[in-house]
Amino acid sequence: MRITIRDIQQMRDRGERIPMVTAYDYTSAQIADRAGIPLILVGDSLGMVVLGYNSTVPVTLDDMIHHTRAVVRGTQKALVIGDLPFLTYTSPEQAMQSAGRMLQEAGAQAVKLEGGVHIAPTIARLVQAGIPVMGHIGFTPQAVNQIGLRVQGRRAAEAQRLLADALAVQEAGAFAIVLELVPAELAQAITERLRIPTIGIGAGAGCSGQVQVWHDMLGLYSDFLPRHAKRYADLATIIAEALSQYASDVRNGTFPGPEHSSRMDPAELAAALGSQDQATE
């Protein structure tokens, strides 16, 4: 049985920290699900770590639906959240269409979108239509060309704006909210003032939960490692060593071995080749 947004709220109410990771394909989703991760985000971060873009801006809704479908097929328990990418929720009507596709075509159980006070009416419309929404404030990657890649909320005026954003997103009906690149003290203060869970990324330990990007935490993305990412494994090195060994085995003829091949009765082979040879004479 899948985890629900009610389960996530109960985790928060019990003081249980909530882990969330990104996943972008069937196999990764299976692994995360088996590991007991309750929230899986199909993030538009796939634009960088899977598709090779330098930001999330080029990612399309079709990209997101394609990858979300795969993640949903790979999970049985985790609640799967699909990001709405850049310029797919510029109005409540467009957001409804985009989120509807994410749930109906991709099978996601919820969507995530970026923004605070200005996006709250859109969140409210989605929630009223029965679409669970996770909010996202602080550093919002889709606005990187406007705000730059920097911590948000260090100054009092910025901090007040972020608190207002968080409260607006909550009152609009979001079931949780991501706080990205927010000072730890501010993130904790926001968390204490909200009724819904906060999921931090680069926002300190005072949030209700944490999210990490799959490729960052497993050492699969070498282009850039954010300060807030913790590398739990160096899978890129392990994979490269395995591929190098495979290439060596092929070149020196040790792979495939007899145990990797099928055999044929010699008499059957002789009969087949004999018939072929006669036909070509």
Curated annotation (Swiss-Prot):
Pathways involved: Cofactor biosynthesis; (R)-pantothenate biosynthesis; (R)-pantoate from 3-methyl-2-oxobutanoate: step 1/2
Entry keyword Protein biosynthesis: no
InterPro entries according to UniProt: Pantoate_hydroxy_MeTrfase, Pyrv/PenolPyrv_kinase-like_dom, Pyrv_kinase-like_dom_sf
Cofactor binding, per record: Binds 1 Mg(2+) ion per subunit.
Pfam families found in the cross-reference section: Pantoate_transf (PF02548)
Any one cellular-component term (Gene Ontology): cytoplasm
Cytoplasm among keywords: yes
Entries under SUPFAM superfamilies matching the protein: Phosphoenolpyruvate/pyruvate domain
EC number(s) recorded for this UniProt protein: 2.1.2.11
Residues covered by region (Disordered): 251-281
Its job: Catalyzes the reversible reaction in which hydroxymethyl group from 5,10-methylenetetrahydrofolate is transferred onto alpha-ketoisovalerate to form ketopantoate.
Similarity comment: family membership: Belongs to the PanB family.
HAMAP family xref list: PanB (MF_00156)
Name by which UniProt lists this protein: 3-methyl-2-oxobutanoate hydroxymethyltransferase
Organism: Chloroflexus aurantiacus (strain ATCC 29366 / DSM 635 / J-10-fl)
Primary gene name: panB
